[in-house]
Curated annotation (Swiss-Prot):
Keywords: Antibiotic resistance, Cell inner membrane, Cell membrane, Cell shape, Cell wall biogenesis/degradation, Hydrolase, Membrane, Peptidoglycan synthesis, Transmembrane, Transmembrane helix. InterPro entries: UppP. Bacitracin is thought to be involved in the inhibition of peptidoglycan synthesis by sequestering undecaprenyl diphosphate, thereby reducing the pool of lipid carrier available. This is Undecaprenyl-diphosphatase 1. Catalyzes the dephosphorylation of undecaprenyl diphosphate (UPP). Confers resistance to bacitracin. The chain crosses the membrane at residues 1-21, 46-66, 91-111, 117-137, 150-170, 193-213, 226-246, 260-280. The lineage of its organism: Bacteria, Pseudomonadati, Pseudomonadota, Alphaproteobacteria, Rhodospirillales. It is a multi-pass membrane protein.
Amino acid sequence: MLLLQIVVLALIQGITEVLPLSSTGHLALLPLLTPWPSPTTWPDQGVALDVAVHLGTLGAVALYFWRDEAAMIGGCLRLLKGKRDPGARLAFLVVLGTLPAVATVLLLAHFAGPIASPGLATIGWTTLGFGLLLGVIDRLCMTVKRVEHMGGIDCLLIGLAQCLALLPGVSRTGVAMTAARLLGYERVESARFSMLLSIPAIAGAATLVGLDLARVGQSAMAPAALIAAVTAFLAAFLAVAAMMAWLRRHGFGPFVAYRVLLGAALLALAYLGPDLAPFLVS
């Protein structure tokens, strides 16, 4: 891959992995809007770059929420000494919220086998539909709860909602934030818990892809992987910081509007044909 392609892919995946957007939608649209050397020959990023981007994004989220992570680690250590601690409770919630997605992935891997690549129309409809759902719920639902108020039922419901992200175009962070807002959690708290849930989710994805890398071996990709990891780290960190700052004073409106536009673009390409791509980039 060209250096510019690596940077563009890392930027897109780093940003869309943490924002309530659709990484699948962007990656589906990318080959049509950036014809290097032609829309039909956009290269596969490869396993090594996939691992690198996941690790870069994971590092960004872990760095931004280091206080929560320190509290969870310290709380678990104090719990081992017989002392109850809010940090240990938060760690329990993160583990509990992750279990539905883990169970779903294992069940699908065992019973369903490989899943066919989705079409543009599917990605477009899910990007658009779940974006509108986030907008409606964000506007209509209460804003009273914090993560400290979260019980096991709410946590499991948010975790179950994450399973919908297995549908391409849904966005894991987006659907988790939507579920949290539906349950009455503050915007910042919804984003915060979604980001904490993303740590085991991204780590798990990186581990699975890393196992593939260990089997096939791509050591020659080390310089490119380093560039991808650093780019994804910077993009994800800035994206998380900007989102959290925005949500302290505003709602999810800009993210909803962007998803509607992205979904509309994907649907236009799906139903009117890729011949529209030159008009979108001109």
